[in-house]
């Protein structure tokens, strides 16, 4: 039998959270989704607040993953230790709050979710994500499926990770760039892959940010606190991975773009 996993790209600002609230449950019903992972690291533009997290869970997320803005809102710190359904990149190390790996029971299967951050063009002193993935896969857990949200800038690093883990995990998707890619595929050994899910946020924006602010920065103006557009339609982007419980691997990938 197969199971459908929905992965949603970076939720950006109030527009993104509201868009998720409007569309997520309808898409889950329409596509017969069994488990949903949402990247929420930009829900407060830079970071995630406990209130944002509650809204995302209420909208239909089973797990929230994060990225380089994990600690953009420090009030999330205690929440990371208390809530096993929020994951920060595991390779940020053991000294920071939270975890980047969890195994969850969705009724049909036990699903492991890993959250890792890349090291190319990201100013982070993170552990090697490839070696961290190896360590997590050797942890002794025996889930039906294993999923990876790889929060990374470089397409090359994401693709290299996919080849490295092909056949060892069920699905890998990239987050962080906020731009959806058109390279969905099932790799030769059965791992489903998409370089980047895109984002959930304002349509008329620059990666979720008010266009005027972004333009001013590129013209030489001083950078400021990220602001989202006052008015814009929203979009929800991501992908559906269809997984086979007999093999633990992927049999199909479908992009999602709802407006």
What does each model-found stretch correspond to?
Residues 1-259:
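Acidic, metal/ion-coordinating pockets
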